[in-house]
Amino acid sequence: LLLASCEVEKPTTPTPTQPEEANTVTGIVVNSQGQPMEGVKVRADNPNGNNIHSEVTTDAAGRYKIKLTSIGSWKIYAWKEVQFMDKTYNLRLGMKNASDYDAFTTEGKTVVRDFVWKLDGRIPDRSASADYGMGYFGGSLYFVNLNGKGYPPMAPGTKVTVTLTPVSGAKYLDGTPATTTVTKSFTITDGNSNYYIGDIKVANYRMSIKGEHNGVERVVWMGHKSSIGDFFQWLDFYF
């Protein structure tokens, strides 16, 4: 039988939790991998007053805290400035729960509202329109059914399928590799020349389009920038 002695540490006294701060909203901002995001702008707006708001930026741990007045209700937003393909974008960040987008009152307490960077999906507090690509975190593409340079417009009833394949080395707005091919469809209708596809994770893609009408499938030739110029079977683009 072997015996050994060791020093036993006395149990430490638990640190009391920090008391709630009255009329405060706080939380943490993370990216799609759950990592904290520093330097994100967080803004609380009071819709009951004229230009009543307060703004802060997140610290290195992705945390923020805003002291609010107890008057009325508040809505809170977060934005991230991103450099992508030599352009600057101010992107609204999402929230963990749909109910977090609603206005809230502090009622003398601390309210927690966390944010997460979403590359696609519905924005719960915005009207959504499939016809105009609005109300989503992802980007949208606008197509016009044209008659130009000897190419007739597609006939009503044509099912149009758009395939977006990330080019080599493409990345999404958050810097993660773009690996998912996107396929979306719409149908040509009589009297309508304009069509949208939406909620696409923004990246650099190669686009190809096919049309199917009466069981016959054809390649759709495309131009860009709404100009009737050269047409191509595919295009590399970003948005």
Predicted features along the sequence, with ranges:
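Long luminal/extracellular ectodomains of secretory-pathway precursor proteins
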Residues: 6-24, 28, 35-239
